[in-house]
């Protein structure tokens, strides 16, 4: 997974004229400058900085790399818009339509194509389109170009594993010595991508002790077990371990691949491409929220930022009393949190904090605000800023190093690169259940094209732990129709602020990309002392950072990147009351409520105050107009005036002039628990209201948003559900 790029042909369907236009857009977004364009008080004009200022995003092979990624990852509708814009800009009349007077010339043929329009005029075109309020689909298309192009130029590495731009921005990859050469799940792993053909896979399954046979008539490999778990993340890992320890033969299906510490890459680009859903770029239908979700063995726990927070008391009270799910106020649930805490080795120890956490802590203390220490499932001396790419030190204890290890040690088998496609259902004639259907297992498919047969896993118990985005899709494909499936989606919307703190700021050492990711937290309280938001710090490689930054000009974006290593970013996270939906085709729609926007605004303003109090010389938001303020010599009145302009309105497809793109790393609620089938897709035991023997064991069962990092909540809930499954299964067998 190193991601080093050799010279090769690029696989996309764009015409050469479209790629030329894409190159012109890339050059406009990240153009070449002479070093004199740099501010006088910037970094000295070393060779690295000179090369950085002279670099252009149009340099080969960047346009083809971006084109290939778009062709592979863009949704069909998005790709249509991309091609329409590129094709129009490839012609003179199309350029006139989109660019107006900026493409006109005094010489024949009087109208330039976009690629031949002078750079300064191209920049004005993009600036105008980023503010366009009427033809928002075209504006959103230019935003898509901006995100993919800018991300690519900083996330890519050459055949030597280098990026020539990193030196100027003082970015170093996380160098890990003595990477543990271990794959703790190896004895229980069947990597279907490595199978030569169906027969080879069959032999691998039987060698692992599974009852597997080939059925040519049904074009299937039939596998029998006690329990099949689709998904290996926070919920699936716990469920697999719990059921396996109860003596059940468990099969885990994971659509991602398995990586040990030596398999992980230190590079941002290949890590996001291989470990995350849609390569780390999964937008809502309106482009307002970018979703990060793990897609590997261990799921989100393999790539999250280690924060371990118990379910808040007020949330448990709401779920038990208002949602009428008593387990959340039980000793059983408290014990489950204790069990999870212990198994993950959670500790509050932190021997050295990162720059961003130092900034959060210093700013809060300067303002007299409370700042809390965030426990982590890693050791106290774990100083790693790249756990979002998988922990190469093997220190962070995700399910791939804890619960799944327990499962494998108790005989569980994990099939990787294998996606659950639909459930095996039949009419329920048992007479012991009110559920109309009975689940008999799962039909799955390997990503390996050499495996031509489907996998038919027959099980007494079937658990969907595909995650909040994919569990509804498995239900839909199986023709389950509870109205709660896919709805009640909560995303913990994240909105960011930034502050630039030069090396001269006392007592704040390090770089923004180094150190423990989340070790501190501040709660933003409203006038009534109710929680409005929390403020934490993120992990942001240079690609993620520049893709998130507002683009107002080519020079501005380069100057921002030269400050990258000392730019501290603060996250405002809210417990969203608004909700969304996972549609049958996987699209995600989502809408914030008015109170959500008010809470986001409160969090943004508080985080800016914290950054100023910590010593930032310049602060700002990630709003599209590049909203920022220099802090040196600023009075309290001037600061308040600036904070009064801070808001978080719609996304690029909305009609607002200055828009914001939020992000989400926590997805919950799309198959929620409910006291009846009108209130939820599953009951308080996690069992589907429609199919006996079908359970859900992931974040999708949570009744509403948690408001804090939900890993502990998901695992504790999964533990309660799976303990109940094991007890009921044992009872039914004995009777």
Where are these regions (language model features)?
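N-terminal Rossmann-like FAD-binding beta1-loop-alpha1 element of flavoenzymes
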Residues: 218-252
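Conserved redox-cofactor binding core of oxidoreductases
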Residues: 151-154, 162-211, 215, 326-427, ...
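Rossmann-like flavin
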Residues: 110, 114-143, 150-153, 297, ...
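FAD cofactor-binding and catalytic pocket of flavoenzymes
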Residues: 482-612, 628, 656, 664-669, ...
């Amino acid at each position: 997974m190193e991601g080093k790029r050799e010279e090769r042909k690029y696989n996309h369907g764009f015409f050469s004229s479209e790629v030329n236009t894409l190159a012109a857009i890339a050059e406009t977004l990240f153009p070449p400058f002479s070093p004199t364009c740099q501010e006088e008080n910037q970094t000295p004009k070393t060779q690295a900085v000179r090369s950085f200022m002279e670099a252009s995003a149009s340099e080969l092979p960047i346009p083809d790399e971006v084109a290939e990624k778009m062709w592979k990852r863009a949704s069909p509708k998005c790709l249509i818009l991309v091609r329409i814009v590129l094709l129009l800009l490839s012609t003179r009349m199309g350029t006139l339509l989109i660019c107006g007077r900026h493409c006109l010339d005094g010489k024949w043929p009087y109208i330039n194509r976009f690629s031949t329009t002078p750079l300064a005029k191209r920049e004005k075109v993009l600036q105008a389109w980023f503010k366009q309020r009427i033809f928002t689909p075209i504006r959103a298309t230019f935003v898509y170009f901006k995100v993919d192009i800018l991300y690519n130029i900083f996330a890519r590495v050459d055949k030597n594993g280098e990026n020539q731009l990193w030196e100027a921005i003082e970015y170093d990859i996380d160098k890990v010595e003595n990477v543990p050469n271990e794959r703790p799940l190896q004895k229980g792993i069947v990597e279907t991508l490595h199978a030569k053909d169906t027969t080879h896979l069959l032999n691998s399954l039987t060698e692992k002790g599974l009852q597997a046979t080939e059925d040519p008539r049904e074009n299937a490999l039939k596998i029998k077990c006690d329990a099949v778990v689709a998904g290996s993340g926070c919920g699936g890992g716990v469920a697999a371990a719990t059921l396996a320890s109860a003596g059940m033969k468990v099969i885990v299906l994971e659509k991602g691949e398995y990586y040990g510490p030596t398999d992980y890459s230190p590079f941002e680009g290949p890590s996001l491409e291989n470990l995350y859903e849609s390569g780390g770029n999964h937008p809502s239908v309106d482009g307002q929220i970018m979703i990060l979700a793990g897609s590997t063995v261990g799921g989100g726990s393999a790539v999250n930022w280690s924060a371990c927070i118990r379910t808040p008391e007020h949330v448990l009270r709401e779920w038990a009393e208002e949602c009428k799910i008593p387990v959340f106020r039980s000793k059983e649930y408290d014990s489950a949190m204790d069990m999870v805490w212990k198994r993950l080795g959670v500790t509050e120890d932190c021997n050295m904090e990162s720059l961003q956490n130092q900034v959060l802590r210093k700013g809060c203390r300067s303002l007299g605000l409370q700042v809390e220490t965030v426990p982590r499932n890693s050791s106290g001396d774990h100083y790693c800023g790249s756990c979002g790419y998988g922990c190469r030190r093997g220190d962070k204890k995700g399910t791939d190093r804890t619960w799944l290890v327990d499962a494998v040690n108790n005989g569980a088998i994990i099939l990787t690169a294998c996606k659950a496609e639909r459930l095996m259902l039949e009419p329920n004639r048992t007479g012991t259940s009110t559920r109309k259907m009975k689940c008999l297992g799962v039909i799955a498919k390997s990503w390996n094209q050499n495996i031509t047969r489907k996998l038919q896993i027959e099980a007494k118990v079937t658990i969907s732990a595909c995650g909040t985005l994919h569990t509804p899709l498995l239900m839909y494909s199986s023709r389950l129709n509870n109205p709660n499936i896919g709805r009640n989606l909560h995303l913990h919307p994240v909105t960011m602020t930034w502050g630039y703190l030069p090396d001269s700021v006392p007592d704040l050492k390090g770089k923004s990309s180094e150190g423990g990711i989340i070790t501190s937290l501040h709660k933003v309280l409203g006038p009534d002392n109710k929680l409005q938001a929390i403020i934490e710090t993120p992990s942001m490689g240079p690609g993620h950072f520049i893709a998130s930054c507002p683009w107002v000009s080519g020079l501005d974006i380069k100057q921002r990147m030269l400050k990258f290593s000392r730019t501290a970013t603060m996250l405002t996270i809210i417990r969203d009351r608004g909700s969304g939906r996972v549609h049958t085709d996987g699209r995600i729609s989502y809408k914030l409520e008015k109170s959500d926007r008010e809470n986001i605004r409160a969090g943004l303003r508080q985080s800016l105050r914290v950054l100023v109090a910590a010593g930032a010389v310049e602060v700002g938001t990630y709003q599209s107009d590049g909203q920022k303020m220099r802090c040196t010599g600023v009075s309290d009145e001037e600061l308040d005036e600036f904070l009064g302009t801070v808001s978080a309105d719609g996304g690029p497809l909305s009609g607002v002039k200055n828009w914001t793109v939020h992000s989400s790393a926590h997805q919950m609620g799309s198959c929620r628990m409910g006291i009846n089938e009108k209130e939820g897709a599953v009951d308080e035991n996690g069992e589907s209201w429609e199919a006996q023997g079908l359970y859900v064991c992931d974040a999708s069962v949570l009744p509403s948003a948690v408001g804090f990092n939900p890993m502990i909540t998901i695992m504790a809930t999964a533990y309660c559900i799976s303990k109940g499954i094991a007890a009921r299964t044992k009872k039914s067998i004995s009777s």
